[in-house]
Amino acid sequence: MGKVRHSPKEGYFGEFGGRYSPEILHDALAELETTYKKLKKNKHFKKELEYYRKNYIGRPSPLTYAERLTKVWDGARIWLKREDLNHTGAHKINNTIGQVLIAKAMGKTRIIAETGAGQHGVATATVGAMFQMETVVYMGEEDLRRQELNAIRMRMMGAKVVGVSSGTATLKDATSEAMRDWALNVSNTHYIVGSSIGPHPFPTIVRDFQSVIGIESRKQFKKVNGKLPNAVIACVGGGSNSIGMFYGFLRDKKVKLFGVEAGGYSTEPGHHSATIQFGRTGFLHGTKTLVIQDEFGQIVPAHSVSAGLDYPGVGPEHAYFHKSGRVTYVNVDDDGALDAFLEICQIEGIIPALETAHAFRFAKDLAKSMGKKEDILICLSGRGDKDVAEVARLRKGEFS
């Protein structure tokens, strides 16, 4: 296993990362990096961030022992980090609260975002309303169909939701449109990137704001159990909830870390979003990382039943963790995720996001291979209210 580097050198994680962006964005990215470095050391910023985490998001989020799952799966004990209980229903608010404070410090009056499952869009609309900033969210037309509820929530909070019909009309295309908007309106606009992707310093900023998940989890788990979990599992699309969860345990070599990508409906190109398994080193949205691409280096469309995992790349720090061997990456197919979604609903009375359902499906197999005195901690990245209509459509109303 290679040495894990927590602080990137000039925006790199090993060979991955960097800043590959249009010249028009260079000054904005430099301003963002400089401002963030200053704010990280600023006592008032830290105090303000902590205030909103506690009094607006509702942190710390609970650690829940999944007693029924543990009994039914008949293996390792199952624990859940409940990011679904945050305000807005997912981990995304951890990042948007932090970034809107950066935007305010830079004097920006307008914020924009991309979104897939809609949770980052909702979280951005939320902070836009709270800080009275003009808010625009880009969302693929296919995702607007799948996640109509979240689109309505964004509009109710005053955000303008722009449907993107180019390409596959999903997260990659929404991200591209948001980048174009930022390039055209860089003087008054901050782009709140939603995942641990994009040009430096975005992967580091997003990781830092999401690291509260793992830091809290480690402290909570040790307090309850007097030890650390044997395994930590989180779903991976771009990778923000997982990078945040893993961050708390990176130095604990005895804790195995597992990232679960979307296996789609086959291993054929265009049928999955399993970037770690099938991707090659390339460039996407301003960063050097692993990308699903064809023999000519063209981006191959991604697919997942889950809009939040439907992305043909992965955050550069995840690419680094894969290459270093610190994190093991696997994938779960659409049917497996749908089965797990319903199983968690019916066994624990929790409706999980389809993204997290991928992690649950892998956890089931892992738990059965472990001892009953061992522990698995799962990042429940968000609630699945947004997914119930799509699951009902795909399962034709049959939930048994």
UniProtKB/Swiss-Prot annotation:
Which domain of life, per UniProt? Bacteria
Alphabetical keyword list: Amino-acid biosynthesis, Aromatic amino acid biosynthesis, Lyase, Pyridoxal phosphate, Tryptophan biosynthesis
Respond yes or no to whether keyword Lyase is given for this record: yes
Provide the positions where the record notes the PTM N6-(pyridoxal phosphate)lysine.
K92
Cofactor(s) it depends on:
pyridoxal 5'-phosphate
- Which top-level enzyme class is recorded in the Swiss-Prot or TrEMBL entry? lyase
User: Which Enzyme Commission number(s) are listed?
Assistant: 4.2.1.20
Q: Which GO terms describe its cellular component?
A: cytoplasm
For this UniProt entry, the molecular function terms from Gene Ontology, in alphabetical order, are: tryptophan synthase activity
Reaction catalyzed:
(1S,2R)-1-C-(indol-3-yl)glycerol 3-phosphate + L-serine = D-glyceraldehyde 3-phosphate + L-tryptophan + H2O
Which Gene3D superfamilies does the UniProt entry name for this protein? 3.40.50.1100
Pathway note: Amino-acid biosynthesis; L-tryptophan biosynthesis; L-tryptophan from chorismate: step 5/5
Q: What is the documented function of this protein?
A: The beta subunit is responsible for the synthesis of L-tryptophan from indole and L-serine.
The record's similarity note reads:
Belongs to the TrpB family.
**How is the subunit organization of this protein annotated in UniProt?**
Tetramer of two alpha and two beta chains.
**What protein am I looking at?**
Tryptophan synthase beta chain
Per the UniProt record, the source organism is Leptospira borgpetersenii serovar Hardjo-bovis (strain JB197)
Q: What is the lineage of its organism?
A: Bacteria, Pseudomonadati, Spirochaetota, Spirochaetia, Leptospirales
